[in-house]
Amino acid sequence: MHFQKCDYLFDNQVKLRLQHNAIRFRLKRSEVEEFARTGRVEEKIISGSSVNQMFGYALESTEKVSSLKATVRPGAIIVQVPPETVMRWASTDQIGIEGEQAVDNQTSLRILIEKDFACIDGTDEQNADTFPNPLIEERKLSEISC
């Protein structure tokens, strides 16, 4: 897997990226723990005082699904994940959970949930509560051996 430099500066929030018919969530350590413990993590963006000016997104652990399932509706995205998948991911060094959801005969929605790694060039504050980045460790080892 390829690790990239961080292109965002948000702290302590489930990170969401929407691109090319794909949904990607990144969770910090405490969020992975919360997801495993409570079965849900969520965030919202509020741009005004009315309900129409709010956008929410959530990950939900439920036995109602056997694979990743996304529901997109006005003002919200909810991705459901089987509980055993969540527990295996949260309790191991598995980096992510990935799936595809058929939309029609020619289109699918890619869903990816990842552990958030420390940014290579990030500050201590930006890297708080993240998972160790293997590239940082490799860099440290190569500096020692030179």
Language-model regions, residue ranges each:
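Short, flexible domain-boundary/linker segments around small modular repeats
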Residues: 1-11, 52-62, 113
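Short, structured motif recognition centered on aromatic/hydrophobic residues
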Residues: 16-18, 23-27, 77-81
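Extended intrinsically disordered, low-complexity coil regions enriched in Ser, Thr, Gly, Ala
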Residues: 28-50, 89-105
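Conserved loop->alpha-helix
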Residues: 39-41, 48-69, 73-75
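Mid-chain, well-packed structural core segment of small domains
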Residues: 66-103
